[in-house]
Amino acid sequence: MESSGLRAPCSLLVLLSALVLPPTLAIEVYTDREVYGTVGSRVTLSCSFWSSEWISDDVSVTWHYQPDHSREMYSIFHYAKGQPSIDAGVFKDRIEWVGSPKWKDASIVLHNLELIDNGTFTCDVKNPPDVVGKSSYVHLQVQEKGAARAGLVLGIIIAVALALVIVVTILILLIRYCWLRRQVRVQRELSALERGKLHKAKDSSKRSSRQTPILYAMLDQTRGKASEKKGKGGIGDSRKDRK
């Protein structure tokens, strides 16, 4: 009986704590997915984060590196208590801290890039008590200067070719549009001419139909006059014969 009586207040406390206490939000880290560089140059590995808590003095940043074709991961940089530290390794004296935790920035710069630097870099940020979250990674690809220039030239050639294709396509469409418009205009003019011819033909037919009775009347008059003249001429001849 006593145990059941104790369980009820405990369960009630758990329920109240679940309702009153805010849920824990995971810290979110963001990086680029791919970064390119050339031998001897430098590249910035950008890393930003978002935390539901105020940025405390206990915020920490850790960068790890995993070479291509390798399963091993190395710690190359660490920031804690306001102090950056570079771990011993291939990036010793080649890493520069350019981040600012107050501005939620955890970026670093790699100097004097080499071909062996190709690999995946992981950025991990902790802001106690907000320590739950996933790291973000960025892949670095280092190329020779000649290869980079060749890639740049190839990209320019492809861009120019695409631009030419677009221009030619636009010209073809414009020519086709103008041709179709001209055809429509010509058809309209022809139809207008045909309508005018039909109208003239109708008018002429009406006029001819109106003039036909007049012509017939004129012919009848001329025929009557001719017959009268013939009649008069016949009477005169007969009188002459009688004399």
UniProtKB/Swiss-Prot annotation:
Cellular compartments per GO CC: plasma membrane
Record topological domains on the Extracellular side: 27-154
Residues in Ig-like V-type domain copies: 27-141
Taxonomic superkingdom: Eukaryota
Residue span of region Disordered: 201-243
Subcellular localization: Cell membrane
UniProt feature, compositional bias: Basic and acidic residues: 222-243
Membrane-spanning segments: 155-175
Membrane topology: Single-pass type I membrane protein
Intrachain S-S bonds: C47-C123
Function description: Creation of an extracellular membrane face which guides the wrapping process and ultimately compacts adjacent lamellae.
UniProt-listed PANTHER family: MYELIN P0 RELATED, MYELIN PROTEIN P0
Name of this chain's protein: Myelin protein P0
Gene: mpz
